[in-house]
A protein has these predicted regions:
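Phosphate- and other anionic-substrate recognition elements at nucleic-acid/protein interfaces
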Residues: 1-174
């Protein structure tokens, strides 16, 4: 069985990344209609990734996304929205018969940040996980463009996290 991996960074600024067995990487921003996630289009993206993988390799890719926990400092609205999105992603995997793993952020970050010096948020003692993720991703995927559009100048945090989650799944043989 030849495996591919779909990593999903849940959130309105999240991303969907498909890591093909040959190393090719497809990445999409979580589709939005104004301020709402376009779940129908998101489903279509995942369905297409799954169908192509199944057609080529006669098996489903494995989907990895974050198991949500308490996010200190976030509002009730944000917590509800994230939980809603997580449930929707899980149902997409179930409906498409894609095997999936929900992984706590600290678990995949511990593995993927190996060898990356700790970076702190300016003026604070907290780790800057977005900066550390970008450093890790650039080391693991040299030459990869982490922007999602031609006009973008900054790396897309959601793409970086989704790619690292897919790599975590690949390394763990999920």
């Amino acid at each position: 069985m030849i495996k591919g991996y779909i990593g999903i960074d849940i959130g309105k600024k999240g991303a969907i990344v498909y890591q093909h067995p040959d190393g090719k990487i497809e990445a999409y921003a979580v589709p939005m209609i104004k301020d709402e996630v376009d779940y129908a289009f998101m489903y279509d993206i995942i369905q297409l990734m799954n169908a192509r993988h199944y057609e080529l390799y006669d098996c489903h890719p494995h989907m990895i996304f974050e198991k949500l926990g308490v996010i200190f400092g976030s509002s009730k609205t944000t917590a509800f929205s994230m939980g809603h999105q997580s449930g929707a992603v899980e149902m997409m995997a179930i409906a498409l018969r894609i095997p999936y793993t929900k992984i706590p952020a600290k678990q995949w970050q511990k593995e993927m940040f190996t060898g990356v010096e700790e970076i702190t948020i300016t003026g604070k003692t907290a780790r800057d996980t977005k900066a550390m993720a970008l450093v890790a991703a650039k080391r693991l995927f040299p030459g990869q463009d982490f922007t999602l559009t031609e006009r973008a100048t900054k790396p897309h945090d959601g793409m970086v996290d989704a790619l690292l989650m897919s790599e975590y799944g690949k390394r763990k043989g999920l």
